[in-house]
A protein has these predicted regions:
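N-terminal export and membrane-targeting signals
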Residues: 1-16
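C-terminal motif of bacterial Sec signal peptides marking the signal peptidase cleavage site
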Residues: 20-23
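Intrinsically disordered, low-complexity prosegments and terminal tails associated
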Residues: 25-292
């Protein structure tokens, strides 16, 4: 399940941080079925135009995007009791790739909720490339429902998420590790972790973009299209024997997908995740389209 994969990844990041900290000196502190309201008109220039203008560095593009992003439809429904998330993910597990479709409803008041998971058979080997055909297969897969009592479905980071970029970066990865080769990877893992675990409002999305702008080795690829056919702005982070690609919505600043390939002794796919839907609902049985 995606929750398990995220928990494992978070624990792995924590272990890595602990091992690295032991060898370095501390540094300075550094919706329901209701029709969503229309998005707020964007400022001029548009986010996409500002971020894709020629001659800009990747950090400049991300900061421009952070300063000009528009409201997402679900920003207007945050008063509803449940945060809803729908993802599809391909994740390395030793020598196989697991394939999962996850729908999650979290009651924000007490962190109770429900998850519905569909799984496809694991794929042996690490050279697997996710395909659109696999996405269609999820619809016919069996479902597993898991219910969580109060306190059992915690978000990646405690709410409310910081909107100060320095504070958010410190929550995602210890500042003391800023000089370590793994630090950029830890930061981008943290950004993916919050994007695939909890709803980010406009200010919080802007903060994550500013965190990415400060990630060493950040690169820009231009427009890219993910496995769900959505086009966004492609950014990459290369660090610690891996390369991670993020595709970001050019108007709202939402992370649409994340794809990590690792190199070294066991090269291949590490993870690929599509964030298909995110928003808020009145119950833990409704989706944004209104279908259960």
């Amino acid at each position: 399940m995606l929750r398990t994969a995220l928990t494992t990844r978070r624990c792995s990041a924590g272990l890595l941080a602990g091992l690295l900290l032991a060898g370095c000196q501390p540094g300075p502190s550094g919706s329901s079925s209701a029709t969503p309201a229309p998005a707020t008109p964007s400022a001029s220039p548009s986010p996409a135009l500002a971020a894709t203008a020629p001659g800009l560095t990747p950090p400049q593009r991300l900061r421009l995007l952070a300063g000009t992003i528009t409201a997402a439809p679900a920003d207007r429904t945050i008063d509803l009791p449940y945060s809803y998330l729908h993802t599809q993910s391909w994740t390395r597990a030793t020598n196989v790739i697991t394939r999962s479709d996850l729908q999650r409803w979290r009651r924000d008041a007490d962190y109770s909720g429900r998850e519905v998971t569909r799984r496809l058979p694991d794929v042996r080997g690490l050279a697997h490339r996710p395909t659109s055909d696999e996405r269609r297969q999820f619809a016919a897969a069996g479902t597993k429902t898991t219910r969580y009592v109060s306190g059992d479905l915690e978000p990646y980071l405690p709410e409310p998420l910081p909107t100060d970029p320095a504070e958010l970066a410190s929550a995602l990865a210890p500042y003391e590790l800023a000089g370590e080769p793994a630090y950029p990877r830890m930061l981008v893992h943290g950004v993916i972790g919050v994007a695939t675990s909890q709803y980010l409002d406009r200010a919080q999305r802007a903060a994550t973009l500013r965190v990415l702008a400060d990630v060493p080795t950040i690169g820009y690829q231009g427009e890219r299209t993910d496995l769900a056919g959505r086009t966004g702005l492609g950014f990459t982070v290369s660090a610690d024997n891996s390369q991670t690609q993020l595709i970001i919505h050019p108007s709202t600043g939402e992370v649409l997908s994340a794809h990590e390939q690792v190199h070294g002794a066991k090269p291949g796919l590490f993870s690929y995740v599509l964030i298909l839907e995110r928003g808020h609902t009145t119950t833990d049985t409704r989706t944004l389209s209104g279908r259960p």
